[in-house]
Amino acid sequence: MEIVRLSLFGNPNIGVYVFANNSIALVPPSLSSGEKKVIAETLDVELVETKIANTILNGVLVVGNDNGIILPRIILDEELDILNNNLKKHDLNIYVSRSKNTALGNILLCNNKACIAGSELERQELNKISEALGVEALYKDIMNLTIPGSLAVVTDKGGVIHPDISDDENRELKEIFKVAFERATVNSGIPFIKSGLIANNKGIIVGEYTTGPEILRIRRGLSGGAI
């Protein structure tokens, strides 16, 4: 599995800017051609260029898997049109959440087997998200924090997570997502690993300040294999 370092907009916190599954990546329209090439080739995905809610924080505001994507209620009509037009061929469900929580990439953590949500998400939204993504969705705070999506990254091969997670919680996540999670940091010690990491089943992109030992742990976690 290929793993590369990257900064976007001069910032190693690349995970806040990009949402990716195994077929597409939603990227801000202002990326350079070189940056877009790295993302497309490393993850082996088609790029869809769009802002979300007139921001470049696609990784914070969007969540999903290979069955669907979940968008915040503050998305603009013209942005939704771009997504509808570009995602038809990928047969993705598109659901615009009505949740008061708009940072969906932080409050939700999903792969193609399960989805967990922080306890602040409304019950009716959890049910609709489960339907759109085609997986069981359940409430699960991590480390007493309601932002599981910012604490971890998970694919269908493995996961990486905040280094302070307890053994018991780590085992619970393994049971839910059917993959093992490796404790790791990114960008020279940042424990909120989503901020500096973009990954799918085919490739891994880490923030430019990620160290060699961090890369080894991230690679081990995301190459772990389904159980």
From Swiss-Prot:
Q: Which InterPro entries match?
A: eIF6
Task: Kindly list the biological process annotations in GO that this record carries.
Answer: cytosolic ribosome assembly
Q: Which domain of life is it from?
A: Archaea
Question: What keywords are assigned to this protein?
Answer: Initiation factor, Protein biosynthesis
Q: Does the keyword Transferase apply?
A: no
Query: Protein biosynthesis: present as a keyword of the record?
Result: yes
Q: What SUPFAM superfamilies does UniProt report for this protein, alphabetically?
A: Pentein
Give a GO molecular function annotation for the protein. Answer: ribosome binding
Q: PANTHER family given for it?
A: TRANSLATION INITIATION FACTOR 6
Similarity remark: Belongs to the eIF-6 family.
HAMAP family per record: eIF_6
Protein's job: Binds to the 50S ribosomal subunit and prevents its association with the 30S ribosomal subunit to form the 70S initiation complex.
Protein's name in the database = Translation initiation factor 6
Q: What's the encoding gene here?
A: eif6
